[in-house]
Amino acid sequence: MNTEKLKDIKARIKDFKSYKTSNSKIQQKINPFSIALDLVSGTMVGLLIGILTDKFFNSKPLFLIIFTIIGMIAGFNIIRRK
């Protein structure tokens, strides 16, 4: 009786491992829409922060340029981590 339980447990573990590897392959595929969304959203957040900071300090578009570049870098970093 114990050997039957042991075989059952081993079969369940084997099924779980095969299920886990099949799901990881699905998650490795990167959706192009997700890439575009990450890049555009990072840039837009940088633009928004830059515009608001320029209005707050009443300055030329210095902060707009700085935060736009930072937003683009953040978008590329998010894509790279995926």
Swiss-Prot record:
Keywords: Cell membrane, Membrane, Transmembrane, Transmembrane helix. InterPro entries: ATPase_put. Pfam families: ATPase_gene1. GO terms for cellular component: plasma membrane. It is found in: Cell membrane. The chain crosses the membrane at residues 32-52, 59-79. The keyword DNA-binding does not apply. It is a multi-pass membrane protein. This is Uncharacterized protein RP024. It comes from Rickettsia prowazekii (strain Madrid E).
